[in-house]
Amino acid sequence: MGSGSSSYRPKAIYLDIDGRIQKVIFSKYCNSSDIMDLFCIATGLPRNTTISLLTTDDAMVSIDPTMPANSERTPYKVRPVAIKQLSAGVEDKRTTSRGQSAERPLRDRRVVGLEQPRREGAFESGQVEPRPREPQGCCQEGQRIPPEREELIQSVLAQVAEQFSRAFKINELKAEVANHLAVLEKRVELEGLKVVEIEKCKSDIKKMREELAARSSRTNCPCKYSFLDNHKKLTPRRDVPTYPKYLLSPETIEALRKPTFDVWLWEPNEMLSCLEHMYHDLGLVRDFSINPVTLRRWLFCVHDNYRNNPFHNFRHCFCVAQMMYSMVWLCSLQENFSQMDILILMTAAICHDLDHPGYNNTYQINARTELAVRYNDISPLENHHCAVAFQILAEPECNIFSNIPPDGFKQIRQGMITLILATDMARHAEIMDSFKEKMENFDYSNEEHMTLLKMILIKCCDISNEVRPMEVAEPWVDCLLEEYFMQSDREKSEGLPVAPFMDRDKVTKATAQIGFIKFVLIPMFETVTKLFPMVEEIMLQPLWESRDRYEELKRIDDAMKELQKKTDSLTSGATEKSRERSRDVKNSEGDCA
């Protein structure tokens, strides 16, 4: 604004008129002729007089808009040179031109203003006649205004017009500044909206990435349920699933009842047939009037809602359900459990990890995922597994409990929720302590005791891989570590805490399993052995052997690391000696030279 206003600043020139200082102000838009006329008016000379300006040291000054400004102490002297004789036509033409220029927006840009003389005095003798003083007051009617008076009036009018013009210019500048501020405020507002939009886009991109990862890791089935989309509903197939009904051999049926069953030998369709066989073999289809076609649809829909994670996938679901099935036969659970309890145990085992995303509860809570927010950080995955299970069962085509009375369904629902939530390892110590208290006086007729026992049973089945033979159990360790590493890599990239047992730079297969077997698996199965002694030989003995095997593997790993350190130390020492020899040789060569 400062530079803008300075462009309209007029120039002031001080004239010495016979000892009287006259200040003349004119705009930079005036031309030389206009400035000369203004000086003539100021000195009282006719307008057509040619004058010259002299400095205090009698140097001539060019009369034009770029002439140097002076001060009261160094005024210019005005010296008339000649008077121009103009014809009437030329004078009229100049007058007309002057009248037209007065109509311009800046009101005859020539004259800005005059100041009254500060000091009075006489003109130098021998020069032009002094200008007569005008009488006070207005002219009488009919009296012609003298040219000098007319010029003075024109000058005053020009000054007033210039002031008005400047005022209008200031208003225009104010309006321009106001408009500029409005534009800036609008830009600030738009930038703020952009920030909000960017954050929303980041959130949408994150959701899209998770959805794409979920889609790529799962089979293409119309009955998908994703926790990323609340509006997606299950649309189970209304036709009979097309997987073939395998006729299981007696050897397979016998092996299926044992914990040593090799779960890696079977394709998904074969595993579905095995699960279907379990429901028939345990009498659940008969006792609860389950429609065989509905059972197949339900199993197929469950299969399609397990993701293709390295560990938490449909094969893991089958592994847990098969271990539960084998424990029913090994421990003769049907002698002390009702068929309703067996149905709850088997169905909860099948549904316990539905739609598992491959990232555990710790990640869900630290990353503040939708599941953690929805379930308030309380077992978000286990709550989600329950929700998906009952959303599938809510579809008539998949409701295997459709012929069970409402009270019975309520009991099944409550039992399944209790068991699936018990698979959260964060509750392991709490559940174990409660079960140990009840073990002293365990009562099969006590509902609380039975509920705790069922919770322990599903926990045993969920983490029972090391109970199986080494060739069956060991691949599961690789799968679990792969899923752990996938999570820890993502946690590192997102700046989240990383558990040491998941960090690929810190954990090995041996270190990952030794602590888990010694402090989680063995104590839990030892507690179960007190109720079911037959578990010791079939399940506890393999755990002891597995612990010993991994401890031996750890000793080998430690020995290899120690050997590697020694090798590295020797290599570095040899390298240093070689460098010393090279330096000695160079020094000796230098001495010889």
UniProtKB/Swiss-Prot annotation:
Residues 87-142, 564-593 are annotated as: Disordered. Pathway: Purine metabolism; 3',5'-cyclic GMP degradation; GMP from 3',5'-cyclic GMP: step 1/1. Mg(2+) binds at D353. GO terms for molecular function: 3',5'-cyclic-AMP phosphodiesterase activity; 3',5'-cyclic-GMP phosphodiesterase activity; metal ion binding. Residues 236-557 form the PDEase domain. Homodimer. PANTHER family: CYCLIC NUCLEOTIDE PHOSPHODIESTERASE (PTHR11347). This is High affinity cGMP-specific 3',5'-cyclic phosphodiesterase 9A.
